[in-house]
Amino acid sequence: MNEKRSPRSFPLVPIAVGMIVVLGLVAVLLSRGGDDDGSGVEAGSVATGSIRETRPVSVAGAALPPHGEGVDAAVGLPAPEVTGAAFDGDAVAISNDGTPKVLMFLAHWCPHCQKEVPVVAQWIEQKGAPEGVELVSVATATVAERPNYPPSAWLEREGWQPVVLADDEQGSAATAFGLTAFPFFVALDAQGKVVERVSGELTVQQIEDLVARARGVG
Amino acid sequence: MSTDAVTLLLAFLAVLAQATVAAVLVLSVAGRRLPSVARLGGSMRRFLGPQASSLAVLVAVVATSGSLYFSEIAHFTPCRLCWYQRFVMYPLVPILMMVARRRSRVLQRVAMVIPLLGASVSGYHMAVERFPSLESTTCDPTNPCSLIWVERFGYLTIPTMALSAFLLIATLLWVADPAPIDPPSDDPVVALKGTVS
């Protein structure tokens, strides 16, 4: 330093450091009683009763290629069959049972999924579940440290009616269907073959079109 | 110290940073028209000026420590835009130390550009958090920039805290005084300019 300092210069830096320490103590006091790590329950652990945010799944059949831009190589391929369970442990299966299906893969922390879920929930509430097509949602990419955890509470808050399959911690169901982005939709026809895969937020009209294509009328 | 406590502390500091930046801005703008405010602005410059660049170092150190805490201890994975802000904030620590040591007006002005660059990235990141479709209509399954890890007081997310730090550093560099401290002037215009050479 080549300049003179005022002899009466106020010791701002030490005071600022002291203020940070005091604010730190206030923050510790105010945060007492909350979660130690601020993240809530760990993925897969018991949240309430027998609710688990991730469940083991088993996949039969060949996985679909990853979804990408352009022509979808998965269209016309038989979809893999997935068996697992809902958050409460009830068995859920995505199988070739002769019913067309629309699958919705959701991540609790994804803002686009958080926007899409109320749209679909309201659509079902107003028009009822689509006839002849089964809607199955898959809660995947569940991570306790990420926002809006746990997914079971989120979907309950949103009044979510479709069946939910809780994917495992590795996201095996999502990988089997070639998920590359959220939200992710897969339409399957009555023969269990892929009709269409699409990712991103959909409008009600686009969802209805997807349901119609699963039925084979789109 | 829990993640909750650390985020609350950083939120308190971000609010303080915002208040300081707003106060300096108001005093500087209003001081151009009102002599009484100009005198107050002059006093503020004399108060902050001599140690402003050292305070800027402290702000950069706290912001860097907070960023490292979030990624290394709280395990909040940094996204692409977080990394851009890190690329700006981390080198600011040694750069600002040099500025505080040399106390050269030219260095201060050049260094001011760096936090302003960081602030523009933080501003864009905040916009992406509020309007995720700005980046994409889908979420990257690994780590999208629209993911809000922390939100305090209804608006303070990690990029908002970073923006507050960048703006405070730029403001401190703006008021930092490289010259010896002169006795207070009775002329309000001179007082507003403070010790700017």
What kind of feature is each model-predicted range?
Chain B
Residues M1-R80, M89-L92, L96, A100-S197:
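Secretory/periplasmic and organellar redox-cofactor proteins
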Residues W83:
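Cys/His-coordinated zinc-binding microdomains
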